[in-house]
Regions:
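Catalytic and substrate-binding regions of cell-wall glycan-acting enzymes that process beta-1,4-linked
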Residues: 55-106
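Alpha-helical segment that forms one wall of the substrate-binding/catalytic cleft
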Residues: 5-59, 63-72
């Protein structure tokens, strides 16, 4: 049974680490702003720990799903279904990037 909860599907231990690191002791996983901030915090840690650019949607997604240690071990490589989803997430990100570029928001 996973402890993943809220918009970011953050695990209990990782959420506690986030609150300790950021000092946001009142942050809630059920609050979209807090969950979004958590994701930024986690992705920045992933960049530092795993060397994955913030612009690398595919690998950031894989590391978010598998955890930073799981990603480093390559646990996702045995999960073709997950690799396919990560590709779809990256394609969606590229589509949003193009749309934002056209409307002058990027």
């Amino acid at each position: 049974q996973s402890s993943a909860y809220g918009y970011a599907q953050a695990l209990d231990g990782t959420w506690s680490e986030y609150k300790d690191d950021t000092g946001r002791i009142l942050a809630r996983r059920s609050n979209i702003r807090d969950a979004s901030d958590f994701m930024g915090w986690y992705m920045t840690k992933t960049k530092r720990r795993n060397g994955i650019s913030l612009a690398d949607t595919r690998n950031q997604y894989l590391a978010y799903h598998e955890g930073q240690t799981g990603f480093a071990r390559g646990s996702y490589k045995r999960k073709k279904w997950l690799i396919n989803i990560a590709g779809k997430v990256a394609n969606r990100s590229d589509m949003y990037k193009r749309q934002l570029s056209r409307c002058g928001r990027l």
